[in-house]
C-alpha cells in the first residue's frame, strides 16, 4: 500500500511540474538542432579495399603462403600510416595536406583472418575524402613491393563519389537531446522537492514535525 502511495505521490509531483518537464526537453531539442545544423561540421568518409599477396617460393604451400600473408597484415596497416607513404602522398597533393593531417584523416582496419585491408579517410569535404583515400591506396600499392617481399598489391575497390556522411547524425543528436532534457527536468523537479521544507499537507505535519493532527480547516 505504501508503495502505491509513493507512486501516486511521485506522479503528482511530476504532474505538478509538467511545464518544466515539457519545456526543458524542448529547449534542449532546439539547442541541439541549432548546433547540429549550424555549428557542427559535416564529416564524410570514403574507403578503399586492398589485398596484399606475399611472394611465393617453390617450396611454399598455398596454405602457408596465406598464413604468412595474414600474419603480415598488421605490418601492412602500419606501413600505410607511415611517413614513407604519407610523405609521398603529401607531395602528390603539392603540400596541400601535411603528413600529420593525412594521418589524422586516416583509419586502417582489417577483419580477423582476412588479407583484405580497408583504408578509410574522413574529412569535411566529400570529394576530397575520395581523392585522398584513392591516392594513399595507389601510393601504397606502388611502393609496397619495394618495402617488403610481396608479390602484388591489388586495389579491390576504389572510392568514386561514394563518400558517406558520418557526422553529425541528426536523428541521434536530437533523440539524445530530448533524453538529456527529460533527465535534467526530473533531477531539477526532485531536487526542488527535496529542498522545499514548507509544510503543505497533513502528512507533512506528522512526518516533519512529529505532531498529531487534531483537526483541519476546509477550504471554501
Swiss-Prot record:
It is found in: Cell membrane. GO terms for molecular function: protein tyrosine kinase activity. Its main location: membrane. It holds the Pfam family Wzz. GO terms for biological process: capsule polysaccharide biosynthetic process. Pathway: Capsule biogenesis; capsule polysaccharide biosynthesis. It is a multi-pass membrane protein. Keywords: Capsule biogenesis/degradation, Cell membrane, Exopolysaccharide synthesis, Membrane, Transmembrane, Transmembrane helix. The chain crosses the membrane at residues 20-40, 171-191. Signal peptide: none annotated. GO terms for cellular component: plasma membrane. Belongs to the CpsC/CapA family. Required for the biosynthesis of type 1 capsular polysaccharide. This is Capsular polysaccharide biosynthesis protein CapA.
